[in-house]
């Protein structure tokens, strides 16, 4: 299949960019962007490669994405080696095909076509690319955003190419994401012999009423954009492995995916009040990996919806479901942020694949978004 989007996607897949190793992907993208007049600024932090590229001036539309991928798992279970892109029955197989090297290729080809047709475009077109989204994400988009904010860089609109679609490309557009807050809680007791409970203090027994009340809380009812806040216990650990020792500590890890009805401080206050109510001795550590954000109907959402309707003749759903993305960092700049990408049915799985025709369609959608906002 001869298509610039497919060919570039295949070139990217051949580079085994296991997070945070870029494996040469960004050099390939930079070469293409510089060829059409983009200024490129590399912004590497520690082991992570990032770049910020721009062309033109004024109102700014950025396309954001990541070159890194998750490990392929058992390569023998793939129908073809995971880093050897193969097209079968119209599907392009390879690690990163959907998440998100196909989107990156579609963005770059869309930019090439857009610049060819609008060499003197009115606004500024930009790219924010990182090699660490799948792993810690500590030195990726968040660091670039901090650097851009420190120098008052302008960013009005941002299109993140994460695989947002469910069945056909564009059927779901993410115009926001829930916040994510993790609590690492240790309940302290006194270790002892199970035959002498009066000489010990069992933290599991003490914590049970607290945990029972915690899981029963209705945090909020959500709103028209967000589902209700969810709390899930992810890990519980206690004991020595022996059946005759009362443990001295209980470790509980739980995560909140929260809506704009709450703040992380409100959640923390309610959890701490509950711990005090049950008179527990504890230490607690919080990790906020992202605040909730929402892009309401406006120029970016309208442009994305228009592009999907024009090329796929469907009306996309605007949703905020799913995990976190780098959009949570970019939203701090005050930009309107929307995610539009290919079907996500096989991401992170054995035999990850994407419909080759969808990538061609996606490039057309991206180009139309550029034309509506910065032409």
UniProtKB/Swiss-Prot annotation:
Active-site residues, as the UniProt record annotates them: 68, 133
Similarity section: Belongs to the peptidase M20A family. DapE subfamily.
Pathway: Amino-acid biosynthesis; L-lysine biosynthesis via DAP pathway; LL-2,6-diaminopimelate from (S)-tetrahydrodipicolinate (succinylase route): step 3/3
Listed name of the protein: Succinyl-diaminopimelate desuccinylase
Keywords of this entry: Amino-acid biosynthesis, Cobalt, Diaminopimelate biosynthesis, Hydrolase, Lysine biosynthesis, Metal-binding, Zinc
Keyword ATP-binding: no
Gene that this polypeptide is encoded by: dapE
Residues that bind Zn(2+) 1: 66, 99, 162
Function: Catalyzes the hydrolysis of N-succinyl-L,L-diaminopimelic acid (SDAP), forming succinate and LL-2,6-diaminopimelate (DAP), an intermediate involved in the bacterial biosynthesis of lysine and meso-diaminopimelic acid, an essential component of bacterial cell walls.
Organism annotation: Escherichia coli O7:K1 (strain IAI39 / ExPEC)
Lineage: Bacteria, Pseudomonadati, Pseudomonadota, Gammaproteobacteria, Enterobacterales
């Amino acid at each position: 299949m001869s298509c610039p989007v497919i060919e570039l996607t295949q070139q990217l897949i051949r580079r085994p960019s296991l997070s945070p190793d870029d494996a040469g992907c960004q050099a390939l993208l930079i070469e293409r962007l510089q060829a059409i007049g983009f200024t490129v600024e590399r912004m590497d932090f520690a082991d992570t490669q990032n770049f910020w590229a721009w062309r033109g001036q004024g109102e700014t539309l950025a396309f954001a994405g990541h070159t890194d991928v998750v490990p392929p798992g058992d390569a023998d279970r793939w129908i073809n080696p995971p880093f050897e892109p193969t097209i079968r029955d119209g599907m392009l197989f390879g690690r990163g095909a959907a998440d998100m090297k196909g989107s990156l290729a579609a963005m770059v080809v869309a930019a090439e076509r857009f610049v060819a047709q609008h060499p003197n475009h009115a606004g500024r077109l930009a790219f924010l690319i990182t090699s660490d989204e799948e792993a810690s994400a500590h030195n990726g988009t968040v660091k670039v955003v901090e650097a851009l904010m420190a120098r008052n860089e302008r960013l009005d609109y941002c299109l993140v190419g994460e695989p947002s679609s469910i069945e056909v490309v564009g059927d779901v557009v993410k115009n926001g994401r829930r916040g994510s807050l993790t609590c690492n809680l240790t309940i302290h007791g006194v270790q002892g012999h199970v035959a002498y409970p009066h000489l010990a203090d069992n933290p599991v027994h003490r914590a049970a009423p607290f945990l029972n009340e915690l899981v029963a809380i209705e945090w909020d009812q959500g709103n028209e954009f967000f589902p209700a806040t969810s709390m899930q216990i992810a890990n519980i650990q206690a004991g020595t492995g022996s059946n005759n020792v009362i443990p001295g500590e209980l470790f509980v890890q739980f995560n909140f995916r929260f809506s704009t009805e709450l703040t992380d401080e409100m959640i923390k206050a309610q959890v701490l009040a509950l711990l005090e109510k049950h008179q527990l001795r504890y230490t607690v550590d919080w990790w906020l990996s992202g605040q909730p954000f929402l892009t309401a109907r406006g120029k970016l959402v309208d442009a994305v919806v228009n592009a999907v309707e024009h090329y796929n003749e469907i009306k996309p759903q605007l949703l905020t479901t799913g995990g976190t993305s780098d959009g949570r960092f970019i939203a701090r700049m005050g930009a309107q942020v929307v995610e539009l990408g290919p079907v996500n049915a096989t991401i992170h799985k054995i035999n990850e694949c994407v419909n080759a025709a969808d990538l061609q369609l996606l490039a057309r959608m991206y180009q139309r978004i550029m034309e509506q906002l910065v032409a």
